[in-house]
């Protein structure tokens, strides 16, 4: 029987509901409980797949091909449970489902309303998402008081009544600002945030109080008095030097035990040894490297959230402090490759659109010709192939049909047919919708014998997540191979190129898949670990 923890935020956005939810889930998992987390997004887009990274940040892809909120990446990095399309839904998705039912006649001609039809669909999705686990945390996006959040909060209110106190509790994350000139923390914003919640019928059971520094006992007592939350359940959550300290921080305030007490559950003692080891590795590096990440969305680093984290995870597993130098690809075009000279390794991540392409190609060429370790991901693999075609094979005008449909040498082209994660054939053409039409989700890849990528993974077949609609054009494979480019991996049906390598290079690997989506701080990822190790060796050679 699943218990639900509903997580809301108040006062301001970006307080860290996702990290707080994931950290609590990690502590509960460390007590032997099976945990999952849902993210409910109030925006009207069906999913974030077509949203600009500047608007939304990264689109995180699950094994089953769902394009989801980046918070699901945090969830997977903190707990062992794999997220699926059930773990994230939006207002747009809910309305789409309800309207489809209305068109089908499921409501028998009745008037379709927010209550009960929209709220019922939200409740149905929450209960389905929590099926089969001990505890499901449900994070409501946005801030209490937002007009977009109202149907979700009403659904939570109804579920709390229907499930009862033994199966549902509300945890509210709020800001307790520290006013330096007065030398004190202010509890009024929290009081008003809870007042707003109570006005719609929701009484928090737990308050997580975000603050610059730990709030004192008197402030906690005052918050407890004015919000009707027991004092021990007013939990401080001060700024931390590392997000990996937060599970231990929450456990030190007995938040996990408070949750279990409220649910009437018993569980094993907390074992956070793995997280303590992560923190130990983070705080005791033996090496330091600089990675030049050359991309398009450098003004919003959340656009590469999983990639940033994967590089840091690799640093943990090689005892290396990883500094990421974020370089706008257009700056390479205007300033030249000299801005890459301090890098121990170069990385070109995924992306869409032609802007910055030439700068990425310049970065690839610099890495290839100067023997600097290079990792290309998704578009980073496609740019590696284009650069190789232009500068090694001398195919002037080689390009992707995404950027130039009239290219004389279209070495990258649209995928028109592939097998999806369910084993079904999917087809697309130039007129297909942009939303939800890419090759998405976990796909099996076959790694070639004697390739670097097979040596890195240590096995012949791997499963990695994808998000793309363009691929290497097989018409040019013979030329690419003859020129010295090695095909390191293929799709399961041996029709799509998954990995390319430059053999006469210390470390040059580019992949069509997104390995960053499966990297975690506790386990790392073999590809990133090998890449950072190559950067360490490059750094030592340069000394």
Swiss-Prot record:
Q: What class of enzyme is it?
A: ligase
Q: Where does ATP bind?
A: 14-19, 71
How is the activity of this protein regulated? Allosterically activated by GTP, when glutamine is the substrate; GTP has no effect on the reaction when ammonia is the substrate. The allosteric effector GTP functions by stabilizing the protein conformation that binds the tetrahedral intermediate(s) formed during glutamine hydrolysis. Inhibited by the product CTP, via allosteric rather than competitive inhibition.
Q: Which residues are noted in the entry as Mg(2+)-binding? A: 71, 139
Give start-end of the signal peptide: none
Which Gene3D superfamilies does this entry report, sorted A to Z?
3.40.50.880, P-loop containing nucleotide triphosphate hydrolases
Alphabetized UniProt keyword annotations? ATP-binding, Glutamine amidotransferase, Ligase, Magnesium, Metal-binding, Nucleotide-binding, Pyrimidine biosynthesis
| Known pathway | Pyrimidine metabolism; CTP biosynthesis via de novo pathway; CTP from UDP: step 2/2
Keyword Methyltransferase tagged: no
| Entry GO CC | cytosol
The GO biological-process annotations, alphabetized, read as:
'de novo' CTP biosynthetic process; pyrimidine nucleobase biosynthetic process
Domain named Glutamine amidotransferase type-1 is located at 290-541
Q: Which Pfam families match?
A: CTP_synth_N (PF06418), GATase (PF00117)
Annotated positions binding CTP: 13, 146-148, 186-191, 222
Q: Name one GO molecular function term.
A: metal ion binding
For this protein, the Enzyme Commission number is 6.3.4.2
Q: Which domain of life is it from?
A: Bacteria
Instruction: Give residues annotated as binding L-glutamine.
Output: 351, 379-382, 402, 469
Q: Which residues form the active site?
A: 378, 514, 516
Reactions mediated catalytically? UTP + L-glutamine + ATP + H2O = CTP + L-glutamate + ADP + phosphate + 2 H(+); L-glutamine + H2O = L-glutamate + NH4(+); UTP + NH4(+) + ATP = CTP + ADP + phosphate + 2 H(+)
Q: What binding partners and quaternary form does the record give?
A: Homotetramer.
Function per UniProt: Catalyzes the ATP-dependent amination of UTP to CTP with either L-glutamine or ammonia as the source of nitrogen. Regulates intracellular CTP levels through interactions with the four ribonucleotide triphosphates.
**Entries under PANTHER family matching the protein:** CTP SYNTHASE, CTP SYNTHASE-RELATED
Family recorded in the similarity comment: Belongs to the CTP synthase family.
Other comments?
CTPSs have evolved a hybrid strategy for distinguishing between UTP and CTP. The overlapping regions of the product feedback inhibitory and substrate sites recognize a common feature in both compounds, the triphosphate moiety. To differentiate isosteric substrate and product pyrimidine rings, an additional pocket far from the expected kinase/ligase catalytic site, specifically recognizes the cytosine and ribose portions of the product inhibitor.
This chain belongs to the protein called: CTP synthase
Give the source lineage, highest ranks first.
Bacteria, Pseudomonadati, Pseudomonadota, Gammaproteobacteria, Cellvibrionales
- What gene name does this entry carry? pyrG
């Amino acid at each position: 029987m699943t218990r639900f923890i509903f997580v809301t935020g108040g006062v301001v956005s970006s307080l860290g509901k996702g990290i707080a939810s994931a950290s609590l889930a990690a502590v509960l998992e460390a007590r032997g409980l099976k945990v999952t987390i849902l993210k409910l997004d109030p925006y009207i887009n069906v999913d974030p797949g077509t949203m600009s990274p500047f608007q939304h940040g990264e689109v995180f892809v699950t094994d089953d091909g769902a394009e989801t909120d980046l918070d699901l990446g945090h969830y997977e990095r903190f707990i062992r449970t794999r997220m699926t399309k059930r773990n994230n839904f939006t207002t747009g998705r809910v309305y789409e489902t309800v309207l489809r039912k209305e068109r089908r006649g499921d409501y028998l001609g009745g008037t379709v309303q927010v209550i009960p039809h929209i709220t019922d669909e939200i409740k149905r999705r929450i209960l389905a998402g929590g099926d089969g686990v001990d505890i499901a945390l449900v994070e409501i996006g946005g801030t209490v008081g937002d007009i977009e959040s109202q149907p979700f909060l009403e659904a939570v209110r109804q579920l709390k009544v229907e499930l009862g106190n033994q199966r549902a509790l509300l945890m509210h994350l709020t800001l307790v600002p520290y006013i330096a000139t007065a030398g004190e923390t202010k509890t009024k914003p929290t009081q008003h945030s809870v007042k707003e919640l109570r006005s719609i019928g929701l009484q928090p059971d737990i308050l997580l109080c975000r603050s610059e520094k730990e709030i004192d006992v008197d402030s906690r007592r005052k918050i407890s008095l004015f919000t009707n939350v027991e004092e021990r359940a007013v939990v401080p959550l001060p700024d931390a030097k590392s997000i990996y300290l937060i599970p231990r921080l929450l456990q030190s305030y007995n938040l996990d035990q408070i949750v279990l007490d409220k649910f009437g559950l018993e569980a094993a003692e907390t074992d956070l040894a793995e997280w303590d080891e992560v923190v130990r590795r983070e705080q005791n590096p033996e090496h330091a490297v600089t990675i030049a990440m050359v991309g398009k969305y450098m003004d919003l680093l959340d656009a590469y959230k999983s990639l940033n984290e994967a590089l840091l995870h690799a640093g943990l597993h090689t005892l290396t402090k990883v500094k990421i130098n974020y370089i706008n690809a257009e700056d390479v075009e205007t300033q030249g490759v000299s801005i890459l000279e301090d890098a121990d390794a170069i990385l070109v991540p995924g992306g869409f659109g032609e802007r910055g392409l030439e700068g990425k190609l310049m970065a690839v060429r610099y890495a290839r010709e100067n023997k600097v370790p290079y990792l290309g991901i998704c578009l980073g693999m496609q740019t590696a192939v284009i650069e190789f075609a232009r500068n090694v094979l001398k195919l002037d005008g080689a390009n992707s049909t995404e950027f130039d449909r009239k290219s004389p040498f279209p070495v990258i082209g649209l995928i028109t047919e592939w097998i999806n994660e369910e084993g079904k054939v999917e087809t697309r053409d130039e007129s297909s919708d942009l939303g939800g039409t890419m090759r998405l989700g976990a796909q099996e890849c076959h790694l070639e014998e004697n390739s670097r990528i097979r040596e890195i993974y240590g096995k012949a077949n791997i499963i990695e997540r994808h998000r793309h609609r363009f691929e290497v054009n097989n018409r040019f494979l013979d030329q690419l191979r003859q020129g010295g480019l090695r095909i390191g991996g293929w799709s399961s049906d041996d029709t799509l190129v998954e990995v390319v390598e430059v053999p006469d290079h210390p470390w040059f690997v580019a992949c069509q898949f997104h390995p960053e989506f499966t990297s975690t701080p506790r386990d790392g990822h073999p590809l990133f670990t090998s890449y950072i190790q190559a950067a360490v060796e490059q750094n030592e050679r340069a000394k």
